UniProtKB/Swiss-Prot annotation:
Species name: Drosophila yakuba (Fruit fly)
Ranges per topology, Lumenal: 58-68
Protein name, entry field: Vacuolar ATPase assembly integral membrane protein VMA21 homolog
HAMAP family on file: VMA21
Predominant cellular place of this UniProt entry's protein: endoplasmic reticulum
Cytoplasmic topological domain: 1-36, 90-105
Cellular localization per UniProt: Endoplasmic reticulum membrane; Endoplasmic reticulum-Golgi intermediate compartment membrane; Cytoplasmic vesicle, COPII-coated vesicle membrane
Amino acid sequence: MSTKNKKAAGGNGGAPKQTRQQSHDSQDYSSFKTVLFYCMLIVFLPVLTFFVLKGFVLDQFLDISEVKVNIASAVGAVVALHVALGLYIYRAYFGAPGSKASKTD
């Protein structure tokens, strides 16, 4: 029997390995999307919070000085940053539902 026939007679020897690789790739992609989402949230949420508070909320509706508006907007941005970090840490610590690591041999 030649090596060509042995490979043909062997069946799907590579199929479980390929399926396992696709499963790992899917998990890696899911992890990448999660980390990218939280990175963007941590970067953009405080910036958006600062400018929304400064431009639309505090300047429009409250009659306070410019310095106090900037300080209040900065405090709001710091609070938003802590909320985003807290969400990331909570997700990293407790994990997503169904994301338990399973060992396969």
